[in-house]
Amino acid sequence: MPTKFRIYTETFYNKTNAQRLPVMLYLTLSLVLAIVSTLSLNNKKQKKTRLVSSVLTWVMLIHTTLLLALRWYVSGHLPMSNGYETMQFMAWATLIVTLVMQKRFLPVKQFGPLLSSFALLVAMITDGNPQITQLMPVLQSPLLSVHVMVIMFSYALFGLTALIGLQGLIAHHRKQEEKEQQLAALSQFLLFPAVALIAIGIFIGAIWANVSWGRYWSWDSKETWALITMLIYSAPLHADIKWLRKAQHMHIYMLLAFLSVLMTYFGVNYFLSGMHSYA
């Protein structure tokens, strides 16, 4: 029997998590901030948007941390078992990346809350706060939780490179060559930890698969697309690809490359079948 405190906690969580207003408010504010930051050349406006962006990032982080912690306590396991929980974690991971990098990289500060808001919106729309249930025995391994967390951090970084790519194309259109070059360099810098994380995530997933299913790799749909995604994002790290040396081409590549992430996370679940169909 659950304790009274656990019942109270679950009731509080259900009431808190069911509110859609905060998500829509986060999305609206972060979208406005991203647009103003991208288009404004006024230093005073830039300072104001940076301040508001910092406050919004902290508010969102506290909120998502609370939701994840409550769901963890109520369920008794790390909230990494379905699409709703992983998108919430991606929102949280994006905010962590934003706070770590915002002092040195302004575009991350500008787009972090927006990407996090989109992740929360997708979580709200797709699964809509699914019922908390016990995990199947095969999903109770700590390796699986670590695998998912590492992969979602890499997706957060890939998402940021896509938004930076969009800003880079806007800078190209506005003839801001220096800014365009800086954004391309930032995207390439972010690719190093992002590709490393997805590679580590795939490796940990293979170890878990061997423990659970008796084989490291089965060419499952999601495994295959995760590998494809890693290879696609690895390409810009090779200096001998001349086409990607041009900033505009780099930004276009980052936008198109994110389609592989969308296919890996969403497309596989809806259009293909495999052992990851529950994810």
Tell what function each PLM region has.
Residues M1-A279:
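Polytopic transmembrane helical bundles with strong interfacial aromatic enrichment
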